[in-house]
Amino acid sequence: MSSQYDDDSRDRSECKSKSPTVLSSYCIDSILGRRSPCKVRQLGAQSLPAPVRPDHEMTTEVTSKENSFDSDMHLPPKLRRLYGPGGKYLDSGRGFHEHLEKGERERLLDQACESLKISQAPQVSISRSKSYRENAPFSQSDEGQSPEHMAQELVELSTLKFEEDVVKEEACGDNSLSPKDEESLHNDGDVKDGEDSVCLSAGSDSEEGMLKRKQRRYRTTFTSYQLEELERAFQKTHYPDVFTREELAMRLDLTEARVQVWFQNRRAKWRKREKAGVQAHPTGLPFPGPLAAAHPLSHYLEGGPFPPHPHPALESAWTAAAAAAAAFPGLAPPPNSSALPPATPLGLGTFLGTAMFRHPAFIGPTFGRLFSSMGPLTSASTAAALLRQTAPPVESPVQPSAALPEPPSSSSSTAADRRASSIAALRLKAKEHSAQLTQLNILPSGTAGKEVC
């Protein structure tokens, strides 16, 4: 009876030593590179000689392991303490025997630790390799054990092999990172070299800058004769070729580079004036000669003699304005008059503003300022003339003596009055002008038709 009870207690101890919690702790220890107490205990027990180990332990080892995995897997840890492998409740004498078994296990564990002299290494790779080397002779000495124990040793060897693969992968990762580290170190060296080179280049640039400052070229002072010749060449072409520039340089005692720079600056100046709208034509105002000299806007538009060959678009616009003026002889000056009277209420300036400056030739940036300046002047002069007029000019034909030009000071005084007048006065004049226009439209058209015929 006592021998049977001892066998049951041994089976229970084997079951408890092979519980899943102990196996999980072994897995954790194998990952961390340490030996688990269960493994050390097994190795200590296996290292004992065969005559010392009891025979019933050899026979019941396989059955105890099977019972442990069948009975304890579905029970929680607290119930495993109370129930045995067959599901039966344990008696009160179990605690005493368990205490004895626990003391014996601790003694065997101390002996095994002293015999094996296990020391935990700080590096994981070294501890894993050491554990693999230390496990190799034990696996060779366990060849005479049971097949299930051999299978367990194979599982342990496979886990160790997996750990070695992990160590190799880590070593490969270290090798893959080491070129990057070398490259980063090399880049750091390059950066330092680059900084030194930057410092050297900065010093060279400063030296070159000092040389350039010493060799600075002063501004070229052109004489009046040189400027006249250059302006004459610029009137011929804005983009002279290299032969023309060299010829000018030879004739004016200059270098070709100075001539080229002067033409560049002159073109920039000309483009700036053209964009501003001040420069209308290189030679003067695009109007016929006698009319351009006495036009009220001639001083504002930098008037001058008209070129002998005007633009065909300007000619067509001028002919259209002349035809419109000839259609109303009472409203336009006679052909023999040589100037535009500012006092004419609906004179040639009105037709110029309506017919000529609506021509497509004047739609551009060059004449933008011309429109903005001419519009208010013509409207103000027309309004002032309508206010000064007492009777409509359509009823009586205009004589040549009545169309004599006023002095040029009248146009400038009218412009000065317009600038000095306030916004309210301008609005009042505009209202009166619109009233006069309505009165002209109310007049019977029969007389006007007879005069036109």
Swiss-Prot record:
Free-text function comment from the UniProt entry: Transcription factor. Appears to be indispensable for the central nervous system development. May have a role in the neuronal differentiation of the ganglionic eminence and ventral thalamus. May also be involved in axonal guidance in the floor plate.
Record-linked InterPro entries: HD, Homeobox_CS, Homeodomain-like_sf, OAR_dom, Paired_Homeobox_TFs
Domain of life: Eukaryota
SMART domains (alphabetical): HOX
Keyword Protein transport tagged: no
Biased segments, Low complexity type: 401-418
Motif stretch (OAR): 421-434
Presence of keyword tRNA-binding: no
Subcellular location: Nucleus
Entry protein name: Aristaless-related homeobox protein
A single BP term in Gene Ontology: telencephalon development
Basic and acidic residues biased stretches: 7-17, 53-75, 179-195
GO CC annotations on file: nucleus
DNA-binding region location: 215-274
Annotated segments matching region Disordered: 1-21, 49-75, 124-149, 170-212, 390-418
Family: Belongs to the paired homeobox family. Bicoid subfamily.
Keywords of the record: Developmental protein, DNA-binding, Homeobox, Nucleus, Transcription, Transcription regulation
Known tissue expression: Expressed in brain.
CDD domains: homeodomain (cd00086)
Alphabetical list of Gene3D superfamilies matching this protein: Homeodomain-like
A molecular function GO annotation: DNA-binding transcription factor activity, RNA polymerase II-specific
